[in-house]
Amino acid sequence: MKKKIAIIGVGIAGLTLANLIKKNSDFEFMLYEKEESLSLDDGFGIQLAMNSVSILNKIDFQKVNSKDIFHPKAIDFFTIKNEKICDLEISKFNSEYSKYTTLRRSTLIEFLKDEIYTQHLRFGKHIKEVTELKGKILIKFYDNTNDLVDYVVGADGIFSNTRSFFEKKKNQPSFKKAIAV
């Protein structure tokens, strides 16, 4: 019998993991998202370092239309007061197949959702409780449904609620008051 993984969160991390599992393993999986739908608004641009592009290439990232991506040659770093700290020529780190890449977040989400959207994704699933049951993990949701899984992956972002079910300390992100453009 296949082991089952619950992936909590349908952002870039959760969708990427789901695609990797679908393509390369014998695990069953389900993605759970507390929102009612997947936001595909154009939104912000994101930056992908070469390591992340090399991972995305394993799930056919090269299928994304080349008109929708950009490969900058350098990055300038500034303080919050718009004072330049330094610049970095990032094209030196590129390889033939993995290049520093920028694109709209919605473009990446659209690509990631295509292979898993209908059969592996459940919306409106806000976790109420997580308990152990006979060596497995029972996840109860506020909509009075539940799932019994072998593993849980918290991919619900920096302000993750999933972690609170598994660890006592609160994870607080810190902002260093610097930006890169």
List each model region and its residues.
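Beta1/beta-strand and adjacent pyrophosphate-binding region of the FAD-binding site
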Residues: 1-13
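Conserved N-terminal helical subregion
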Residues: 3-5, 22, 49-181
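Active-site flanking residues adjacent to catalytic metal/cofactor-binding acidic residues
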Residues: 8, 32-33, 155-156
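Charged, low-complexity surface patches
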Residues: 10, 45, 101
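Conserved Rossmann-like nucleotide-cofactor binding loop
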Residues: 13, 37, 159
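Glycine-rich FAD pyrophosphate-binding loop
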Residues: 20-42
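Conserved N-terminal glycine-rich FAD pyrophosphate-binding loop of Rossmann-like flavoproteins
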Residues: 37-55
